[in-house]
């Protein structure tokens, strides 16, 4: 009889817990499980989207129309940013400066990764130099950039001033670039050569 009484007491305790908040415990556990399943599904979609973006990015190969489609379909994917930078460089080499500028502008607007921002700024400034849009180049280079990449931006400013025939300003910008570059940087010689040609 004592075993029956202990068993009945356990059942009553379980009922009491269930009625006094046990439903919430179960609800929290179910919500947690659903959240986890949702997270796993989301990660699967992100991975699948990245794989699709990478596949499409490999097919762009300098085609501005394909790049625009990729940018629209996968605007937040790193593969899209990389394809934009590569396509912009190919378009620049082909003399399609307006299309190259659009690709660099897209990177500046859509990917805030410091290295991509710096690369797009520097290269967009080079496009503007070729188009003789010196004010646009300097405006592009005036945007904030991670301190790590400031020497590249200063060098690009020097290039803009040099293209305008402003030797003093170019020299100052190149000096700023040199001052912030590490001593073992391979870019130092190039900047020193540019300074000597002013």
Residue ranges of predicted features:
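N-terminal positive-inside, membrane-proximal cytosolic segments immediately preceding the first
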Residues: 1-31, 48
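Soluble extracytoplasmic domains of inner/organellar membrane proteins
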Residues: 84, 92-198
């Amino acid at each position: 009889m004592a075993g029956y009484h202990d068993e009945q007491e356990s059942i009553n305790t379980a009922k009491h817990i269930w009625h006094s908040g046990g439903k919430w415990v179960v609800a929290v556990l179910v919500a947690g499980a659903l959240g986890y399943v949702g997270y796993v599904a989301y990660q699967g979609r992100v991975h699948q989207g990245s794989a699709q973006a990478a596949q499409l990015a490999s097919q762009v190969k300098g085609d501005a129309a394909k790049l625009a489609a990729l940018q629209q379909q996968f605007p937040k994917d790193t593969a899209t940013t990389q394809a934009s930078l590569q396509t912009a460089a190919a378009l620049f080499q082909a003399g399609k400066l307006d299309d190259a500028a659009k690709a660099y502008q897209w990177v500046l607007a859509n990917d805030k990764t410091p290295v991509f921002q710096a690369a797009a700024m520097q290269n967009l400034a080079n496009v503007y130099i070729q188009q003789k849009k010196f004010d646009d180049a300097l405006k592009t280079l005036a945007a904030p950039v991670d301190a790590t990449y400031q020497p590249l931006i200063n060098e690009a400013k020097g290039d803009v001033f040099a293209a305008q025939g402003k030797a003093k300003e170019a020299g100052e910008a190149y000096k700023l670039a040199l001052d912030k570059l590490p001593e073992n940087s391979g870019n130092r010689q190039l900047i020193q050569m540019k300074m000597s040609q002013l």
